[in-house]
Protein backbone atom coordinates (compact mmCIF):
# COMPACT_ATOMS: atom_id res chain seq x y z
CA UNK A 1 0.00 0.00 0.00
CA UNK A 2 1.23 3.49 -0.83
CA UNK A 3 1.08 5.87 2.13
CA UNK A 4 1.33 9.62 1.61
CA UNK A 5 0.65 10.81 5.17
CA UNK A 6 2.95 10.50 8.17
CA UNK A 7 1.95 11.57 11.69
CA UNK A 8 4.97 12.68 13.72
CA UNK A 9 5.21 12.85 17.51
CA UNK A 10 8.31 14.16 19.24
CA UNK A 11 9.20 13.93 22.89
CA UNK A 12 11.24 16.99 23.77
CA UNK A 13 12.89 18.73 26.69
CA UNK A 14 11.66 22.17 25.67
CA UNK A 15 8.90 23.98 23.86
CA UNK A 16 10.90 26.36 21.69
CA UNK A 17 11.65 25.67 18.04
CA UNK A 18 15.15 24.37 18.89
CA UNK A 19 14.06 22.06 21.70
CA UNK A 20 16.25 19.10 22.59
CA UNK A 21 14.61 15.90 21.31
CA UNK A 22 14.55 12.65 23.30
CA UNK A 23 12.36 10.56 20.98
CA UNK A 24 10.89 10.53 17.49
CA UNK A 25 7.75 8.54 16.81
CA UNK A 26 5.77 8.32 13.58
CA UNK A 27 3.12 6.29 11.80
CA UNK A 28 2.11 6.28 8.15
CA UNK A 29 -1.63 6.37 7.48
CA UNK A 30 -4.31 6.97 4.90
CA UNK A 31 -7.69 8.65 5.20
CA UNK A 32 -9.54 5.33 5.09
CA UNK A 33 -8.21 4.55 8.56
CA UNK A 34 -5.40 2.21 7.53
CA UNK A 35 -2.15 2.42 9.48
CA UNK A 36 1.16 1.66 7.86
CA UNK A 37 4.72 1.22 9.05
CA UNK A 38 5.69 2.86 12.32
CA UNK A 39 8.91 4.43 13.58
CA UNK A 40 10.08 4.95 17.15
CA UNK A 41 13.60 5.61 18.40
CA UNK A 42 14.98 7.40 21.42
CA UNK A 43 17.77 9.95 21.36
CA UNK A 44 20.52 10.34 23.92
CA UNK A 45 19.63 13.68 25.52
CA UNK A 46 23.25 14.83 25.81
CA UNK A 47 23.69 14.27 22.07
CA UNK A 48 20.75 16.53 21.24
CA UNK A 49 21.93 19.23 23.67
CA UNK A 50 25.54 19.02 22.47
CA UNK A 51 24.32 19.71 18.97
CA UNK A 52 22.18 22.75 19.72
CA UNK A 53 19.01 21.30 21.24
CA UNK A 54 17.75 23.54 24.03
CA UNK A 55 16.25 22.39 27.33
CA UNK A 56 13.99 24.58 29.43
CA UNK A 57 13.34 24.28 33.14
CA UNK A 58 9.55 24.26 32.90
CA UNK A 59 9.61 21.24 30.58
CA UNK A 60 12.06 19.38 32.82
CA UNK A 61 9.76 20.05 35.78
CA UNK A 62 6.76 18.87 33.73
CA UNK A 63 8.54 15.59 32.92
CA UNK A 64 9.40 15.12 36.61
CA UNK A 65 5.67 15.25 37.45
CA UNK A 66 4.71 12.60 34.90
CA UNK A 67 4.03 8.93 35.62
CA UNK A 68 6.81 6.43 36.18
CA UNK A 69 5.99 4.91 32.81
CA UNK A 70 6.33 8.25 31.01
CA UNK A 71 9.64 9.00 32.74
CA UNK A 72 11.04 5.65 31.58
CA UNK A 73 11.81 7.44 28.29
CA UNK A 74 14.94 8.68 30.07
CA UNK A 75 16.03 5.18 31.07
CA UNK A 76 16.16 3.88 27.51
CA UNK A 77 19.51 3.68 25.80
CA UNK A 78 19.11 6.42 23.23
CA UNK A 79 21.13 6.73 20.08
CA UNK A 80 23.06 9.78 18.96
CA UNK A 81 20.72 12.39 17.51
CA UNK A 82 22.21 12.31 14.02
CA UNK A 83 21.86 8.50 13.89
CA UNK A 84 18.15 8.68 14.73
CA UNK A 85 17.70 11.49 12.20
CA UNK A 86 19.35 9.31 9.54
CA UNK A 87 17.13 6.34 10.46
CA UNK A 88 14.05 8.57 10.34
CA UNK A 89 15.06 9.95 6.93
CA UNK A 90 15.37 6.37 5.65
CA UNK A 91 11.91 5.58 7.05
CA UNK A 92 10.43 8.62 5.30
CA UNK A 93 12.17 7.91 2.00
CA UNK A 94 10.59 4.46 1.94
CA UNK A 95 7.26 6.17 1.13
CA UNK A 96 8.48 8.12 -1.90
CA UNK A 97 8.69 11.84 -2.49
CA UNK A 98 5.15 13.13 -1.96
CA UNK A 99 4.74 12.83 1.81
CA UNK A 100 2.46 15.03 3.87
CA UNK A 101 3.59 15.57 7.45
CA UNK A 102 1.22 15.88 10.36
CA UNK A 103 2.22 16.83 13.89
CA UNK A 104 1.17 18.65 17.03
CA UNK A 105 0.50 21.99 15.36
CA UNK A 106 2.34 23.57 12.50
CA UNK A 107 4.76 25.31 14.85
CA UNK A 108 5.78 22.46 17.15
CA UNK A 109 6.78 18.94 16.06
CA UNK A 110 7.40 19.74 12.41
CA UNK A 111 9.44 22.88 13.13
CA UNK A 112 11.50 21.28 15.90
CA UNK A 113 12.27 18.30 13.66
CA UNK A 114 13.22 20.54 10.72
CA UNK A 115 15.54 22.54 12.98
CA UNK A 116 17.17 19.35 14.26
CA UNK A 117 17.95 18.35 10.67
CA UNK A 118 19.29 21.84 9.96
CA UNK A 119 21.71 21.58 12.90
CA UNK A 120 23.21 18.44 11.35
CA UNK A 121 23.66 19.77 7.81
What are these regions (language model features)?
Residues 92-93, 107-121:
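Substrate-recognition/cap helix-loop segment adjacent to the acidic, metal-dependent catalytic center
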Residues 2-104:
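Conserved non-catalytic scaffold segment of RNase H-like nuclease domains
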Amino acid sequence: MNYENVMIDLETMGVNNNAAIIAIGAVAFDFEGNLGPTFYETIELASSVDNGGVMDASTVLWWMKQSDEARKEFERDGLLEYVVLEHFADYLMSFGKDIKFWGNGASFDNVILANAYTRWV
